[in-house]
Amino acid sequence: MTRGTEEQGSAWFRDQRDYWWNEDFLALLAQRWRLCDVESLADIGCGLGHWSRLLFPYLSPDARLLGIDRRLEWIQRARQSFDDAYPTPVAAGKVAFQQSDATALAICSDTFDVVTCQTLLMHLAEPFDGLKEMIRITKPQGQVICVEPSNLFNMMSFDSLTPEEDTETLVKSFEFWLRYQRGRIALGKGDISIGELLPGMFAQAGLTDIRVYLRDTAFPLYPPYADPEQSATLEPTHAWKTSATGPWDYDQVRRYFLAGGGSATMLDTQFSTLREQSQRQRRALSEGRYSAAGGAIVYLVCGRKP
Ligand SMILES: C[S@@+](CC[C@H](N)C(=O)[O-])C[C@H]1O[C@@H](n2cnc3c(N)ncnc32)[C@H](O)[C@@H]1O
């Protein structure tokens, strides 16, 4: 699940991100987006390159790829991850990285056939500015492709323990995460559910031929939780076993929740509920009683620059 971690953290670069895409689904998208004709692609907010590394083999054989991130550390590691993933002649000279801010890219207008991002806009205080920059550097008739989640719903996904919860607890939980999300936005930390807004933003920015897809990957958990994907999904849960606050950073949650209009009393009640839920989940996992279908809403939205 793509929880609303601080974008500066590295929680979202855990192993689970390696299972984000089914290979045959990527091949289908590559076909829909006609990536075989694409000779230049820019990945904005590339992080360690998880997204563009997957798209790279589908591009035209001589295509060049530019990964951009504002953090130097990520682009250095992204370069390494391309080197590790592809034999040198494949990527040599074709893949480059640049440190730049998504809202003020140091790139000429009308440069790339495709400009894309995965979970970048959700971290921007002004996501529309980021989108406009992506469009600016796209060639006329080129495509903009954004992959962004709807994390409020992902946080509320049900599992085998949900039927034990009373309705009031679930309603409170929704209010809690809604206030958390709104507080994040108010503090300029980005909208963790921005996926829902992308089609409208694309239309407002003047893109045409807008198409919207949903990622087809789910992260199911069921006993005995044995395969590598399930282990990767559970890995953070194991790491959180030793933490007093479970998976949650109390100070961060507090900041966002209060900024979203929540009260200090509700914060403490809700935080204990979260801790209890986390402990119940761990107990159920160890007893083989926990299961979840593991769906998460992640939109892929593409549009063409006129
Ligand atoms: C959640 S990570 C996603 C990384 C990568 N796209 C992926 O899917 O694995 C968000 C990335 O956006 C970068 N980022 C956040 N704000 C940015 C900005 N204003 N300009 C450029 N990069 C930014 C972060 O440094 C981070 O690498």
Which residues does each PLM region occupy?
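A short glycine-rich, Lys/Arg-flanked "PGG" loop and its adjoining helix->strand segment in the class I
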Residues: 128-143
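C-terminal helical/coil "lid" or tail adjacent to the Rossmann-like core of SAM-dependent
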Residues: 2-12, 213-293
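Acidic carboxylate diad motif detector
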Residues: 146-148
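Class I SAM-dependent methyltransferase SAM/SAH-binding core
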Residues: 40-44, 48-104
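Conserved alpha-helix/loop element of class I SAM-dependent methyltransferases that forms part
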Residues: 19-39, 54
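A short acidic, Gly/Pro-enriched loop at the edge of an enzyme's catalytic core
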Residues: 103-115
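A short SAM/SAH-binding and catalytic strip from SAM-dependent methyltransferases
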Residues: 113-128
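Conserved catalytic/acceptor-binding region of the Class I
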Residues: 150-247
